Amino acid sequence: MELLTFTCCPFEGQMQQKKRRFDANLVQLQESEHRNDQINETVDAELTNECWKLYMRLKPSNEEVSRRQQFVDKLRTILSTEIKDAKLDLFVFGSTENNLAIQQSDVDVCIITNGSKYLNSTCQLAQLLYSYGMKQIVCVSRARVPIVKIWDPQFDIHCDLNINNDVAKINTKMLRLFVSIDPRVRPLGLIIKYWAKQRALCDAAGSGTITSYTISCMLVNFLQTRNPPILPAMLDLMSNDDNKMFVDDIVGFKEKATLNKTSLGRLLIDFFYYYGFSFNYLDSVVSVRSGTVLNKQEKGWAMEVNNSLCVEEPFNTARNLANTADNPSVKGLQSEFQRAFRLMSENNACERLCKICEEYQFLDITNEANYGNTNTPFNTAYESFGCNHTVLPEAAAYPKPYYPPQITLSDGGNMNFLYYIPDESNHQSYENKANRDSDFQGQTSLTQGSAPPWHYIPCQSWLVWYPSEDASNPASGN
């Protein structure tokens, strides 16, 4: 099919700006670093056992893994069918590929054009996917990395797609390699990711916190700085072969990791203590690349803006992954680490995990219509603990476009699609067609049998009228 070039993308949207997660006036940090969390071997074993149980509930089922793969295969088929250019390729990155995905995580896909002239914008990609029945399409072309957000009703998969962001492939390989070194890494990663999601800590664009990739790097660096270390420095994993990025043989790294006998449950408590009390936010930089904690002054980041938390990007050391969080947000993050540590120290094994992952409730809740269905299998993660948690899938963090009711175009010829943009300062009643005719702002022809371009309704304040059996009832986005 011929991909159109848009002057104004009909799928254009933007990340929903939600309420800030942390209020600077409400965040209170604990000054004391006294540890009162000594646990005996029995309690340690119970906590570790509960961690493994939660991990088994959080990781995607075989059925979900299969659906994800079928969805990716479908995307490949769409590209090869409609854009017959051998230069185009796609790869999956992020949590799906690095083995840190929890149930109902989005699938992240990057399309590599390799100089192809047939696909050069996210708006063109959105148009192509719309023609293949993808729903809830939002094109965010003005983001630092432009993306297209979609939902495939066939496989019930939410997906974020970008074009030519190939650095994501390297980051994904790095995390996947770290996860494969020690069997404690993946359970820790999934539990911490779930905790961060429940506590609304990984929404950099929406509420000024950090990304899940950033907190994964913080976990890796925590494990690198244990004594003895569980994970090596990233530089130690780099290959001398110019044709590949990382080494293939990691047996030696696995053997070194076994020298650290700390249990899974103990590591989880230590992680929260480390970033709640021990880590020096004022002077330190998390460095996965070196496997150490760098000095902020020596790195030249002491005077940078939004540097209260510094997490070095492993492959672009000039970039701070945590610069999405300002000073109040970083203090809020630290307070959440402290809260988790306190709760992990005060309760029995079952209650510890249940309490730290209680869902954070914003005081000013956005209209629930924007958030998708929360009655999902993911809500059963804590079923055995007797906890009532509401879990939102990743894609539920973004509002869904308004979709008018489906109609069937009448047979024969072309039809006009008319839309009305109301003047909100002089809102009036539109109970009959006569009142609307004088206010029509524009129209576009539709070929008989084609679907009306519902995505030409990017904001909820538009009123739409279209030819149907009941012309007196326009679809309203209000």
From Swiss-Prot:
This is Poly(A) RNA polymerase cid11. GO terms for cellular component: cytosol; nucleus. Its main location: cytoplasm. GO terms for biological process: mRNA processing; RNA 3'-end processing; snRNA 3'-end processing. The keyword Membrane does not apply. SUPFAM superfamilies: Nucleotidyltransferase, PAP/OAS1 substrate-binding domain. Mg(2+) binds at residues 106, 108. Its cofactor is Mg(2+); Mn(2+). It is found in: Cytoplasm; Nucleus. GO terms for molecular function: ATP binding; metal ion binding; nucleotidyltransferase activity; poly(A) RNA polymerase activity; RNA binding. The lineage of its organism: Eukaryota, Fungi, Dikarya, Ascomycota, Taphrinomycotina. Pfam families: MTPAP-like_central, PAP_assoc. It is an enzyme of class 2 (transferase). Residues 263-317 form the PAP-associated domain. Belongs to the DNA polymerase type-B-like family. Its EC number is 2.7.7.19. It comes from Schizosaccharomyces pombe (strain 972 / ATCC 24843). Residues 428-447 are annotated as: Disordered. It catalyses: RNA(n) + ATP = RNA(n)-3'-adenine ribonucleotide + diphosphate. InterPro entries: MTPAP-like_central (IPR054708), NT_sf (IPR043519), PAP_assoc (IPR002058).
